[in-house]
C-alpha cells in the first residue's frame, strides 16, 4: 500500500472543499478525499495543532510529523472539513484574514468562485479573460510585458499550476494594478448578471464559526487583514497595518495569537520584522522549500498529495 513520504516536519495546506451547498471549484476536494489524505499520510504522523506548535517551538519535532492547516476563513472548511477532523480526533491551524468580518466583501474570493462556477472549466474562463482584456487600454501594456514571460520560471515551486494558471496570475499580480484587475473582473461579472449576494453568504465563515473553531481547540492564526495577492510589494507601513488590524480582530476571539501563514506565499524581510515585532513565533509558507526560519515553515499543498493517492 502506498504511503506519503515525509522527509522533514511541515504543514499540509488546504483551502476549498465541496459538498452540501458548496460547489466544485478549482482545487476543491470533498470529505472523502480529505479522509483519504489523512489515511495516506498516516494518522500517527499527524499531530494536533497545539502539540505540533509546542514541539516546533521546543525543537523536538520528529522528521515524520506534520500538521493540518486551513487558509482564508472559508465556509466550506467549517461545513465539510471540520466534521472529518472531529471524526479523526484531529485539530488544525486556521489562518484567517479579517476584512470579511468587518463588512468588506473581498473581491478576490468572489472572482475565484465566479471563474470556477460560471464556466464549463477553468481553461474556458482563461480563454474568455485573455480575449476580454482587448477591450481595455491596458491591453498593450499586457502584451509588452508578456513578451518576456517565462512560464517555466514563474511560480516554479507551484507545480500544481498549469501554464494558463501561471499566465493568469502573472497578468493579475505582476502586470495589472489591483484597481485595473478589479475593473476588468467587475465588468465581466456585471455582464454575467450573477447574484453576488447569494455568493457572499456561501463563501466565508461567520464570527460564530470562528468562536466554534476556537472552542474545539483548533488554533487561529494571522493571514493579513485584506489578503493582498502580492503582499511583498506593500510598503512597511501598509504591511504593518495589515497584520496589526488582523491581530486586533482575532484577539477578540482568543488572546493567544502566535502563528500565521503568508497570503499567496508573498512576503519579504519587512514582513518578517513586523511579525517578530508582533510576537508571532511561527509562520507558514506555501511551498516545500526547506525551512529558513521560524516564520518560513514549509507546507505541502493538498493537491500534490491528492495526485499521489
Task: Describe each region flagged by the PLM.
Residues 77-81:
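Membrane-embedded segments
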Residues 1-69, 75-76, 111, 215, ...:
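C-terminal active-site subregion of NodB/CE4 polysaccharide deacetylases
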Residues 83, 211, 272-273:
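Alpha-helical segments flanking ligand/cofactor-binding loops in enzyme cores
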Residues 74-75, 226:
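Short active-site segment of divalent metal-dependent hydrolases/proteases
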Residues 9-20, 86-266, 297:
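Metal-dependent polysaccharide deacetylase catalytic core of the NodB/CE4 family, i.e.
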Residues 71, 85:
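Hydrophobic/aromatic pocket-lining and membrane-interface residues
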Amino acid at each position: 500500500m502506498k504511503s506519503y513520504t515525509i522527509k522533514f516536519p511541515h504543514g499540509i495546506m488546504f483551502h476549498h472543499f465541496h459538498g452540501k451547498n458548496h460547489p466544485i471549484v478549482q482545487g476543491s476536494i470533498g470529505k472523502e478525499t480529505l479522509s483519504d489524505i489523512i489515511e495516506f499520510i498516516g494518522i500517527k504522523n499527524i499531530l494536533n495543532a497545539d502539540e505540533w506548535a509546542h514541539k516546533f517551538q521546543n525543537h523536538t519535532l520528529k522528521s515524520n510529523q506534520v500538521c493540518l492547516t486551513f487558509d482564508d476563513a472559508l465556509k466550506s472548511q467549517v461545513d465539510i472539513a471540520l466534521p472529518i477532523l472531529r471524526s479523526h480526533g484531529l485539530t488544525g491551524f486556521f489562518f484567517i484574514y479579517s476584512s470579511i468580518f468587518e463588512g468588506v466583501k473581498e473581491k478576490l474570493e468572489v472572482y475565484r468562485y465566479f471563474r470556477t462556477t460560471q464556466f464549463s472549466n477553468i481553461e474556458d474562463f482563461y480563454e474568455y479573460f485573455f480575449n476580454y482584456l482587448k477591450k481595455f487600454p491596458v491591453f498593450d501594456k499586457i502584451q509588452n510585458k508578456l513578451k518576456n514571460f517565462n512560464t517555466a520560471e514563474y511560480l516554479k515551486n507551484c507545480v500544481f499550476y498549469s501554464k494558463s494558471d501561471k499566465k493568469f496570475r502573472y497578468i493579475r499580480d505582476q502586470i495589472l494594478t489591483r484597481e485595473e484587475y478589479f475593473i476588468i473582473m467587475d465588468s465581466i461579472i456585471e455582464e454575467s448578471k450573477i447574484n453576488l449576494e447569494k455568493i457572499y453568504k456561501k463563501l466565508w465563515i461567520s464570527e460564530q464559526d470562528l468562536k466554534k473553531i476556537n472552542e474545539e481547540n483548533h488554533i487561529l492564526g494571522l493571514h493579513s487583514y485584506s489578503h493582498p495577492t502580492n503582499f511583498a510589494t506593500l510598503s512597511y507601513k501598509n504591511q504593518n497595518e495589515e497584520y496589526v488590524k488582523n491581530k486586533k480582530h482575532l484577539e477578540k476571539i482568543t488572546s493567544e495569537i502566535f502563528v500565521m501563514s503568508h497570503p499567496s506565499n508573498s512576503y519579504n524581510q519587512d514582513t518578517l520584522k513586523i511579525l517578530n515585532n508582533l510576537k508571532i513565533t511561527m509562520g507558514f509558507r506555501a511551498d516545500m522549500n526547506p525551512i529558513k526560519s521560524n516564520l518560513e515553515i514549509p507546507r505541502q499543498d493538498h493537491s500534490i498529495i491528492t495526485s499521489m493517492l
